[in-house]
């Protein structure tokens, strides 16, 4: 009796195995259908190995966006802090980013040289950074613009650029910070001429045509008593985001085995967080203070 049942179970298992193999073969055949050839049209956009991958985002039509949402001129601290919050969110979601730099309506994100994130596909780098940033901009808008409703969603375009060495990466970031200084100095003088001297935008533009850095500083100081060097670092230098170990103090209940009720005590823990700095990137001081950014690549 038992021998018969054992043989019966064995034959059922064998039949089941045959059916499963046939189903698997059918599944493979279905996956490799006649339509699969369309995959040959996909662009192979793998980034070169041993290069820093930089994704730079720029606000699309942000002059209009700033006008529609009543941004302060020449700088709106709310908008700049919102941009930084979005960039911090991107870094926290995509941990292969080692440093980011932002100014005005742009942000650059630097991925590790050794990053194999999404097989180093440029399209993945760009689209995920852009989508995370744009959605964060909408999500956190009310935290910074409490009395200003968002009239329409912002857009950001992106590009991916590869830098083969530490020096070229440092030069790229220096270039963006130099651009921040040039644009902010011009805008500071330009809007002072409009807001305080009553010039029209065209008149202010004509007044500044052909002027050098020293000329703009002289106009600010002699006509408006503004020392450009005293302007906030966030406006003049932009914002640098890096990973740093930060000590966090939290209050939690500590209970001994013999006690019914616990005692609340402050407990300190060290965590790695994204920290915003408004510092100089062009000199060597920053890189000496933060050698960990390039350390793994040396």
UniProtKB/Swiss-Prot annotation:
GO terms, molecular function: ATP binding; GTP binding; guanyl-nucleotide exchange factor activity; identical protein binding; magnesium ion binding; tRNA guanylyltransferase activity
Annotated Mg(2+) 2 binding sites: 58, 105
InterPro entries hit by this protein: Thg1_C_dom, tRNAHis_GuaTrfase_cat, tRNAHis_GuaTrfase_Thg1, tRNAHis_GuaTrfase_Thg1_sf
Gene Ontology biological-process annotations: mitochondrial fusion; protein homotetramerization; response to oxidative stress; stress-induced mitochondrial fusion; tRNA modification; tRNA processing
Cofactors (names): Mg(2+)
Keywords: Cytoplasm, GTP-binding, Magnesium, Metal-binding, Mitochondrion, Nucleotide-binding, Nucleotidyltransferase, Transferase, tRNA processing
Subcellular location: Cytoplasm; Mitochondrion
Superkingdom of the source species: Eukaryota
Catalysed reaction, written as an equation: a 5'-end ribonucleotide-tRNA(His) + GTP + ATP + H2O = a 5'-end phospho-guanosine-ribonucleotide-tRNA(His) + AMP + 2 diphosphate + H(+)
GO CC, any one term: transferase complex
Amino-acid positions noted as binding Mg(2+) 1 in the UniProt annotation, renumbered to this chain: 58-59, 105
EC number from the UniProt entry: 2.7.7.79
Annotated GTP binding sites: 58-63, 104-105
Cofactor, free-text remark: Binds 2 magnesium ions per subunit.
Chief location of this protein within or outside the cell: cytoplasm
Annotated family: Belongs to the tRNA(His) guanylyltransferase family.
Cited function: Adds a GMP to the 5'-end of tRNA(His) after transcription and RNase P cleavage. This step is essential for proper recognition of the tRNA and for the fidelity of protein synthesis. Also functions as a guanyl-nucleotide exchange factor/GEF for the MFN1 and MFN2 mitofusins thereby regulating mitochondrial fusion. By regulating both mitochondrial dynamics and bioenergetic function, it contributes to cell survival following oxidative stress.
Record text on subunit structure and interactions: Homotetramer. Interacts with MFN1 and MFN2; functions as a guanyl-nucleotide exchange factor/GEF for MFN2 and also probably MFN1.
Designated name of the protein: Probable tRNA(His) guanylyltransferase
Source organism: Mus musculus (Mouse)
